[in-house]
Structures are given as structure tokens and as C-alpha cells.
Amino acid sequence: MARRFQEELAAFLFEYDTPRMVLVRNKKVGVIFRLIQLVVLVYVIGWVFLYEKGYQTSSGLISSVSVKLKGLAVTQLPGLGPQVWDVADYVFPAQGDNSFVVMTNFIVTPKQTQGYCAEHPEGGICKEDSGCTPGKAKRKAQGIRTGKCVAFNDTVKTCEIFGWCPVEVDDDIPRPALLREAENFTLFIKNSISFPRFKVNRRNLVEEVNAAHMKTCLFHKTLHPLCPVFQLGYVVQESGQNFSTLAEKGGVVGITIDWHCDLDWHVRHCRPIYEFHGLYEEKNLSPGFNFRFARHFVENGTNYRHLFKVFGIRFDILVDGKAGKFDIIPTMTTIGSGIGIFGVATVLCDLLLLHILPKRHYYKQKKFKYAEDMGPGAAERDLAATSSTLGLQENMRTS
């Protein structure tokens, strides 16, 4: 065991491998070798250079987004009467940026005021005062309990609370949605981007979009792919959802703006690509999107509020992109990597020659030659023997 270890160590320390060129005339190996080289060449030129643009250096972007909406809706509700809803009423927040909500449906509890009343049965049902702990508020409570058990309606008793009365009852969601006209509302997106590495700035109001065109155009993925004005119904439709269904309980829609620019061409070819994605799943545990807000007012010295439970569509605008431009350093790096990949052909063909073909032992003898230093005079004797062999071969060819 020790002797073998010494031999392995000596071989590692004192042996040197040098390549040996062997010309092999074998049609099968030759064809495989050229086919592998062809595949590597197509990969380097077609994929690495042309598709992945390995000759370019790239830069990410910084972005700013602002939006404006337009449209009107009319409702007729008990306690509120006829009401016209404009952009100041149905958009949250008022200063739209890359994330905003358009109200499409709501439940209103009119003229709430601070006082005592029975809480909603969702907060808990009682039979007597002992079931209502004073001052205690459960998770779904709508006020502070007074300790009394009072009638909520003719059949149910609940704990009395001190809070905004009458309490909200949101069991029945209006169908169809109250602001179904939102399907025809229009959304104007302004997007400014910059590629700081290349000092290039662009807006989605590209050269083809002018003032006259913007007054009449609506985005369409084939007819008007650069128009920055979008109809909400079309956006929801392209996201794979139904607007009427989505408007009832609300949902989330993603709008992506992709800037993938090749700056080796003129900058006017750097244009945005819009895509729409449905981020709402009706079958999940908590479907829809909703929140609450209140309108406060004073009447005869008493503070009142109209409480709105709002169902709306939330739009999230996401900007992504990358720009590329020719650079000698990544070009040379890619070329060097491609040349290195050509070595795969040699490795595979050596594997075929030395381990798979029937004549593999013969090729091994031709491929590998072992030389050992035999001391002074050994080189001269080996050279003389080689010369004699070559002379004999020459005489045989001429005879």
C-alpha cells in the first residue's frame, strides 16, 4: 500500500503531460466532429451574439409614472338621491401614481352619528346582559360594549355598543355594480424613463404620438399599440377577466410597461410595450378588493357621516426594461468563450475514439506515448534507432 502511494506521488510530481497531434482518418468520427463544431458555431453566433446580444453592455432603468382618469357615472340610492360621480369621487388616491383604485361598487350607510345601538350579529349574539362584557370589543366589533343585550331585529339580540350608529350592514353586495359605467372610463398614463449609463431619456409619448392623435386614440394592441390612453374595460378584458364580474367585488389588475431597447439603432426605435395581467383569483379565501371611507358633515350642530364600503379595481403599473449598446470588452469576452466551447468537439471525439469504437485500443497506442529519462546516451540511441527506422521505411518505398 505504501509503495503504491509512493508511485502515485512520484507520478504526480515527476510526470508531465504534453498534447500529441494524431491525424485519424475515420469518416464516422470526422462527420461527428464537424457536426459538433457546426452546432457550437450556430449556438455562439445565433444565440449568444444575435439573440442574447453578447456584444453589448447593458443598463437598467429608472422610471416615473403618473396617471389621469376621465369619466362620469350616475347613481340613484335611498338616502342619497341622484348623484353624479366624477374622477374626484371614484379614484383613490386623488393624485394617481403607479398604484390606484377605481371605485366600481359600494355599500353606503347614511347619516351615522355617535350614539348607542345594537351591534351587527357578526360581532356576536347574546340572550341576556351577562353575555355582554362592558368595555370589551371583539375582533369584528363596531363599537365599545355597554354591557346590555338588546334587540338587533325581531329575531336576534346582540350586545349594545357605543359607536357610530346605525351600524353598517354589508351582507348584500349590489348586483350589478353601481358604477358599471367605469368600464368606459379612460386612463391616461405618462411614463418617463432614463438609462443613466447611456444618458438616454425617453417618454411613452413617443414621436408617433402627437396632440391631435391623443385626442381621439384609444389603446389597441394591434391598431394603436403606442397610444397612452386606455379604456378600463379593454384593460380588464386583455388581462383575461370579465369587467362586470370584477366590478361587483373588486380585484387587482397589473399593467406592465416594458422598455427593451437596442441603442445601437436610433433612439426613436426605443418604444414601450404594454401588457395586462389579472392578479385576482375569484376562488381564493378572501375574494375581491374593498376598503372603507367616510364623508363627514355637520347638521343642526350634530356630527354625521356617510360610511362607504368601497369595492374597486386596483391598478398596479409596473415598469421594467433594459438597454444594450455595443462594447468591445463583452464582445471579446464572448468571442473567447465561444472559442473555448469549440473544445467540446475534441473532448467528445476523443471519448468516442478511445472508449467506444472497436479499434479503441489501437487508437490509444497512437494517442499516448510514454517517454522516460534513461540517463546519458539514451537520447542518442533513441534518435539513431528512429533514424534507422525512417531510413528503412524510405528504402522500402523506393524499392
UniProtKB/Swiss-Prot annotation:
Subcellular location(s) of the protein: Cell membrane
Record has Disulfide bond as a keyword: yes
Catalytic activity: Ca(2+)(in) = Ca(2+)(out); K(+)(in) = K(+)(out); Na(+)(in) = Na(+)(out)
Alphabetical keyword list: Apoptosis, ATP-binding, Cell membrane, Disulfide bond, Glycoprotein, Ion channel, Ion transport, Ligand-gated ion channel, Membrane, Nucleotide-binding, Phosphoprotein, Receptor, Transmembrane, Transmembrane helix, Transport
Disulfide bonding pattern of the chain: 117-165, 126-149, 132-159, 217-227, 261-270
Cytoplasmic topological domain: 1-28, 359-399
GO cellular component entries: external side of plasma membrane; glutamatergic synapse; membrane raft; plasma membrane; postsynaptic membrane; presynaptic active zone membrane; protein-containing complex; secretory granule membrane
UniProt name for this protein: P2X purinoceptor 1
Provenance organism: Homo sapiens
